[in-house]
Amino acid sequence: AYETVLSPLTVRISEGRFYLVGLSSRHGTIRNFASVLIKQLTCLGEHFTRPADFDAATYFAHSIGGYGGNKWQARTVRVAVTHRVAAYLRSKPLHHSQLEAGNEHAAVDGRPMFDMHVALTPDFVSLLLSYGAELEVLAPESLRRLMLRKAHALQTLYATPHSTDAVLPA
């Protein structure tokens, strides 16, 4: 836990969680603070000058969830998905920049593909992982390797035998 003087710039709501975005005196930069993690707020009554170049829409343009800003570089991401997931992504895109690749660009095995220009934030990676084996990252290679490391970590976790005699709470 730490204290900072925060000059508030905007509030972001994502996945039912509120984020307070502002200039943090401790960090000297714009930061996002999940409201559920803020232990105490005190209004100092001080005035501050809002940065002229801050625009909330631009700050979050390439992200999903609560992460935003220049720390997270946007990359062009291509995924191949099952037909079931494709139907879902057509109705609820992963990101506003999402476009379905035309038939001439279909994956070798005929799976539908989608492209998007998005920041590779932890919440975006978690969203991709939530589709399990029904979504494959084709590009960029760095994201593909990250997904493989996460898959290996899951395999290691679940390969460890646990007693089936454990009693679960009712």
Placement of each model-derived feature along the sequence:
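Core beta-strand-centered patch of the WYL/Sm-like small regulatory domain
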Residues: 1-78, 83, 169
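Polybasic (Lys/Arg-rich)
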Residues: 61-170
